[in-house]
Design a protein with these regions (language model features):
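A short linear-motif detector with a strong N-terminal bias
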Residues: 6-10, 34-37, 197-199, 247-250
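P-loop NTPase nucleotide-binding core
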Residues: 20-212, 334
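N-terminal pre-Walker A segment at the start of P-loop NTPase domains
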Residues: 1-15
Length: 334
């Protein structure tokens, strides 16, 4: 087992800084009791803040994690879309030759035209051309996502091309709250986010976060709800998972692992109780395709491998002394 503080330190220094921030992606499964997992989740908040990553905490008791579209919506609800759009707008204006003054960080089209004493229509033409280059022609993002981000940036810059109703509909579409997709026809978006396109939307979201100046996305998936019994007489009932739903969730995680080469700058930390290893009905044995990707059948019983996909949290191991030797230069690292 590896102590929580030791593993968190290792994860930040060796996995995130040396791999994820350099364009990598990974999925880690952390097994521990409630106290250890709560400590891990809190420490991930600090880690994300230290590395300027966007943290997306997903709790299976509140979000149906077996559905990839609901997983995307859960991540999207934690994103400040307006702030990201403003960051891109300011960057685009700068690259177009019209940098936003520090004293006017939220300057709109007419404000910027007045500052630079130019025709607003000509300025809009130049900025729209740059929007096309930075956003719409970036094919690392799927088309619907590119269109949505282009419209949000145009709305943030107040170009007059996007109405309040359309901008609000886009924000609702991103978080799964849009009732009528027909509200987005004028924006050339014709379908909702569902399980068939949500994975591509998640790829695109990570790319957009990077454009907005963040170093990456850190997702924490708290799946302890999979193994909790049904509670009777509770007003605020959490989501209950059947065995089929649990296996569907494992299938989504398996796909996430297989798609790590398509993600960049994204780390997923999956938090699970010890039952994940022991429960044959709901644990890793219930879905062999996932087990084959993460389970360490051949491992050292006396030493923990922090690089492994499956990490057992608990009493401190000798990892702490190893890290200390590494910092002093007495060791070449793990």
């Amino acid at each position: 087992m590896i102590g929580v503080s030791e593993y968190t330190r290792f994860f930040e220094d060796h996995c995130l800084q040396l791999y994820i921030l350099d364009g990598g992606a990974t999925v880690k499964f952390c097994i521990g009791d409630d106290a250890d997992l709560e400590t891990l989740l809190v420490s991930m908040e600090t880690t994300a803040s230290n590395l300027k990553m966007v943290l997306a905490p997903i709790d299976a008791s509140r979000i149906k994690v077996q559905m990839i579209d609901q997983l995307f919506f859960g991540v999207a609800r934690g994103i400040d879309w307006n702030t990201l759009s403003r960051t891109i707008v300011n960057r685009v204006c700068g690259s177009a030759g019209f940098p936003i003054p520090n004293e006017h960080p939220k300057a709109a089209l007419t404000d910027l035209a007045e500052i630079y004493s130019c025709d607003p229509r000509e300025l809009q033409r130049d900025i729209n051309r740059e929007f096309q280059k930075v956003i719409f022609k970036d094919h690392n993002m799927v088309q619907d996502f590119r269109i949505a981000m282009l419209r949000l940036c145009q709305y943030e810059f107040r170009t007059g091309q996007v109405s309040d109703v359309e901008a609000e509909a886009i924000n609702q579409w991103l978080v799964g709250e849009l009732k009528q997709v027909s509200l987005l026809r004028s924006a050339r978006i014709f379908r909702k986010v569902d399980r068939t396109n949500a994975r591509g939307m998640l790829f695109s979201l990570v790319r957009w976060i990077n454009k907005g100046g963040y170093s990456g996305l850190l997702v924490t998936l708290d799946l302890r709800q999979f193994f909790k019994p049904r509670v009777v007489g509770t007003d605020d009932l959490p989501i209950l998972y059947s065995r089929a739903a649990v296996i569907d969730a494992y299938e989504s995680l398996r796909q996430l692992i297989d798609n790590t080469d398509e993600f960049k700058n994204m780390a997923t930390v999956v938090c699970l109780p010890p039952e994940f290893l022991n429960d044959r009905m709901r644990g890793v044995d219930a879905y062999q395709a996932l087990k084959l990707r993460i389970y360490d059948e051949v491992r050292d019983q006396s030493r923990d491998n922090p690089f492994g996909s499956l990490v057992r949290l608990g009493a401190s191991s000798d990892l702490g002394s190893h890290l200390a030797r590494t910092e002093k230069g007495d060791d070449n690292g793990c």
